[in-house]
């Protein structure tokens, strides 16, 4: 069960916990059994996105529909911690993970108040290389390590990426003959 797996994780008997159960239940049990990192009050769901050079990590993708600037900043710090634990520093952009905030434009001041205020918090945080805003059409093309957003926006962006990938796969499958030798003439 989820509870047993999370207790094993909290006791350092295992390195990770994977579940196909209810996400809300998993998050609640994880907070109860494992707690959170110091200074982190809000849980976020993180998704790995493919990228041209290395994966990016998008968070939140569904745990928090509305977020404050402080929560978005916490997500950025959690994402940086994840990237730093997975990859040696020389495999990221520099000595610190690169962070962007998902918004409706890349110009300064774009986005809602939480995003605008989070930009200031992240820009002042010496633990990360904050690279500004990013639009959804660049999620799979940009070299940033971490992208932060509220769970509503992140879930929509993730589902749009998944849907586009499924469309391309189906389109290619329909365009190719069932037997590739048939088209070789």
Give, region by region, the residue ranges found by the protein language model:
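Glycine-rich oxoanion-binding loops at beta->alpha junctions
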Residues: 1-13, 65-68, 133-141
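Structural motif
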Residues: 14-17, 24-25, 55-58, 97-101, ...
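Glycine-rich phosphate/nucleotide-binding loop
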Residues: 31-58, 142-147, 151-185
